[in-house]
Structure formats: C-alpha cells, structure tokens
C-alpha cells in the first residue's frame, strides 16, 4: 500500500488516491465522459501496477502520472488519455513559467547589474535603480507569458533555442517599434500628449521643448526609438518666429532711445500688423522679402531716412545676434533634455534621432549650425551626448562640394563627428536613396529611424513613398552564424535552412501584425 509520494520539489507528502481519480475524471469530462467510477478504477489499477513494479518504494509524481497514461491507453480510453496528457503538459508548462520567472525575479531583486546579464541587456536602462528594476520585473514576466501563452510553439521554440531572436518580446501584444515624428504637422495647431493639450509654439525655445515632449510622449506609446525626419525644416519655423519677435523688440528699443515717439512697443506692433495684413510680409533673417522697404515707408511718416536706416541696422544686427544665441541655447537644452528626461516608468531616456542637412534657408542653417556646436561642446562636464542620434544628409548641389550652400555645415558636421561620434551621414545621391528623392519635396529625403532603420518604400502605394509619419511594426533576427556553422560547408543545406527560418519569421511577424492591428486608437494617447 502506497503511503507517501515525493513531490517535484522534493517534499514528502501523504499519498491521496482521490487526487489521481479526480485528475482522471477531469480529463474524461473534457472529452464528454461522465463515469467517475471508471476514473476511480484507473487510479486503483495505477497504484496496483506501481506496487507490482516497485514494491514499497515511495513513488514520485512523475512516475505515477506516467503509469496513469499507460493504464488509460491499455484500458481503451484513448480520448481521455489524450486529454490527460494535454492537461499534464499544461500543468508542467505553468510550473516551468512560475519556476523560471521566480529565478529571474530572484536575480533582479538580489543581484547587482554587474553580476546580472538581465539587468544589463538594455544599456539605456540603469538596472540597479528602483524604476529600472521595476521595469525589468514587468518585462521579464511579459516575456515568459508571451512565450508560453501567445507565441505559436514553433516560434517560441526557435526563439528559445536561439535560431531566431524576436526583438522586444515583452511588447509583443502591446505596441509597435518606432516612428518618424512629423514636427511640422504636429506643431501647426498644437497637440495632445494624452495628459493635456499644448498650444502651437511661438519661439525657438518652445519649439525645442515641445520637440522633446513629443519624443518623450511617443516613446511611452512605443517600444523602439523616436525619430524626427525633418528637424532642420521643423525648427526653422521657430527661428523665424524668434527673429520676427526680436527684430520688432529691437526696433522699439531703438525708437525709445533715438526718437520722441511715445509707447514705441505699441507703435511697432501696430504698423508691423498692418504691413503683415496688407502685404503678408514679416521680418526675416535673409532680409530679402521686401519687409524692410515696407517698414521704411511706414516709418517715413514720423522719421527721417537717416533715422530709419540707423534704427533698421541696429535692429537687424541685434535681432540676428539674439536669435542666434537663443537658437544655440534651445539646441543645447534639447540635447541636455534628451539625455536626462525620463520615459517608460522613469527608468530610461527616450531613444531619439534627428535627421537634418538639406534645408538651405538662413533659419534652417542656423538650427543645424547650433545643434552641431552644442553637440561639439558636450554635456555639463564635457561628456559626449548619446542622444539624440544625429544624421546629416549629404547631397551634391546642397552640401557635398565646395560652393554648395551647406558645404560649410558639411565640414562642421565632419569636425563634430570626429570629436563626438555624431552626426552620422546619409547620402541622398546613393542609388537606393536617390530613386525616391523628388526635388522640392522634403518628405522624400531619406531619413533614419531611432532604431537606425530606414522606411521609405511603399509596395502598396508607390505614390506615398515618403519618410514622415512612417514606422516599423517590429523586428525578428535570424541567427546566420549558427546556420553557417551547422551547414559544415554545405552551401545547399545552408540556403535550405535559411529559407526555412525566413518562412518561420515571416509567419511570426504576420502573426504579430495581426495582434497589433487589432489595437484601439485610445490605447495610444
């Protein structure tokens, strides 16, 4: 008579025949069975068989379950046996999940990052901090759950064995990877972060701050990097607004010093609004749009030609200097913010990239020059800023050759990159980029993601082959070195195995696409 049983964890417990009978009956019920007596009979025969084989030796749980399967099959209960085997497998899998997860939790809780691979797997997260550890708790639990409950067994097995690597498995059912954020469109009428609405910015410092907020906010909706495809064009709008404001302020200052006009600020505001309403003109960095002539005509009613020339020269000089300084400070703030502001549970900074290089306007050039100078200067103690990753676009006729309008910026980019690793360079004239480029359409200029991939082709609709507002679903890598090693020089086998894994990954990514395609808009505020 069996008195004790050895549990999987080594504990010794009293043997209970009813537990075996109940498990068999549940399996029978799952396939339509209703005979509890049959379940009891199988349990008794199992015990008798064990005693016959092993005598008084105490059984393990696994040994009893093996004999239950054998007895069910021999007694002609094939369907119940199949259900019992499935039930046993699911229980085993649940135990494995719990066991693996507990080991991971133990490592995260008690080991430091220097001793834990799990805590170090993302260089952008400090695994020793409270929020870093908390993030890893959630990430580790999600990975275990998805591997055991969501992924198809063949996909999970290939990932677990290292034949493929499903990137960001912890976000499998939650969100997409990365996005090219179109700041021009975003800033036109303001935008919401999900927690409040932000008005359209009206100064380069506001443009810089809201760019960081947009990147940070979107980072909380995605698991990959965030990129701005048109940083120079987008920030140029902020420089334009800043110059206009500073120019009019300096005209008012000069009027106050050199004339007897009362309320000079109100006077300047009034005639500037009239000029804009009548002609659409505003002060601009290039001073080539006719605004100064229109302004001189308005001022001539109160001032002499010499006074007007002096005031305008003073305003231009100081407005340029102040705007340039404000732009440098805005770019400096952007770099410092993107290396210090937190996202994702407060555990990491946004993985950010900015693309620039093609804007030849004075405003765009001022942005590019100052973001590179701020990068070259480094962070507070001179450290090299890791973010944003910067990509400088190079093109003949724009920046590649001496005499090109942005050639000086190209040289500055090379100098900055030599010291600070960034910017990287993308070549618009490269054949695989040039075929998409349409002059006069900045949206067709190649841009790279926060994750350093490029998305511009569009098989579904070739008329929409653009960069802004595009993104990636996700990635899965294939372990090519392993295939090569296993091939042992057999090229044919290598390509057969590669094709098999390509098809496997294709199916896995389509499954992930189907999952994410069912998400609701409200889940991405």
Identify the function of each model-found stretch.
Residues 90-94, 100-525:
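Conserved catalytic cores of very large enzyme subunits
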Residues 1-108:
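Charged, amphipathic alpha-helical regulatory modules used
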């Amino acid at each position: 008579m069996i008195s004790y049983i050895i549990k999987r964890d080594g504990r010794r417990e009293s043997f209970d025949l009813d537990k075996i009978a109940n498990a068999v009956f549940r399996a029978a019920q799952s396939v339509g069975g209703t005979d509890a007596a049959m379940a009891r009979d199988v349990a008794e025969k199992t015990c008798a068989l064990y005693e016959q084989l092993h005598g008084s030796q105490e059984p393990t749980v696994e040994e009893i379950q093996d004999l239950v399967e054998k007895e069910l099959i021999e007694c002609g209960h094939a369907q119940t046996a199949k259900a019992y085997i499935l039930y046993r497998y699911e229980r085993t899998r649940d135990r494995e999940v719990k066991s693996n997860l507990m080991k991971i939790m133990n490592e995260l809780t008690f080991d430091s990052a220097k001793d834990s691979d799990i805590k170090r797997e993302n260089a952008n997260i400090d695994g020793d901090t409270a929020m870093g550890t908390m993030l890893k708790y959630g990430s580790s639990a999600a990975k275990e759950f998805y591997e055991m409950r969501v992924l198809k067994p063949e996909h999970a097995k290939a990932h677990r064995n290292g034949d493929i690597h499903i990137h960001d498995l912890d976000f499998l059912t939650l969100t997409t990877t990365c996005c090219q954020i179109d700041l021009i469109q975003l800033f036109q009428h303001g935008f919401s972060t999900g927690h409040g609405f932000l008005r359209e910015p009206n100064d380069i410092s506001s443009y810089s701050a809201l760019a960081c907020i947009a990147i940070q906010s979107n980072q909380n909706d995605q698991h990959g990097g965030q990129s701005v495809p048109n940083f120079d064009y987008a920030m140029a709008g902020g420089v334009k607004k800043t110059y206009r404001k500073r120019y009019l302020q300096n005209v008012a200052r000069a009027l106050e010093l050199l004339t007897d006009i009362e309320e000079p600020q109100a006077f300047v505001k009034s005639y500037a609004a009239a000029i804009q309403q009548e002609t659409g003109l505003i002060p601009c960095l290039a001073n080539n749009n006719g605004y100064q002539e229109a302004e001189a005509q308005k001022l001539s009613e109160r001032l002499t030609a010499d006074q007007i020339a002096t005031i305008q020269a003073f305003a231009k000089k100081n407005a340029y200097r102040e705007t340039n300084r404000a732009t440098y400070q805005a770019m400096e703030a952007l770099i410092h913010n993107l290396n210090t502001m937190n996202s994702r549970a407060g555990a990491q900074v946004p993985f950010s990239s900015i693309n620039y290089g093609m804007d030849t306007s004075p405003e765009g050039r001022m942005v590019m020059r100052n973001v590179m100078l701020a990068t070259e200067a480094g962070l507070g103690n001179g450290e090299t800023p890791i973010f944003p990753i910067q990509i400088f676009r190079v093109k003949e006729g724009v920046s590649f050759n001496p005499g090109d309008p942005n050639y000086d910026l190209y040289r500055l980019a090379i100098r900055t990159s030599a010291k600070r690793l960034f910017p990287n360079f993308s070549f618009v004239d490269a054949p695989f980029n040039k075929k998409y480029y349409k002059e006069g359409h900045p949206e067709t200029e190649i841009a790279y993601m926060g994750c350093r991939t490029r998305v511009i082709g569009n098989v579904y609709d070739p008329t929409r082959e653009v960069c802004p507002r595009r993104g990636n679903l996700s990635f899965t890598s294939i372990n090519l070195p392993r295939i090569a090693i296993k091939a042992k020089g057999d090229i044919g086998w290598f390509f057969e195995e590669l094709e098999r894994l390509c098809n496997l990954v294709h199916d896995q990514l389509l499954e992930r696409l189907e999952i994410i395609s069912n998400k609701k808009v409200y889940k991405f505020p």
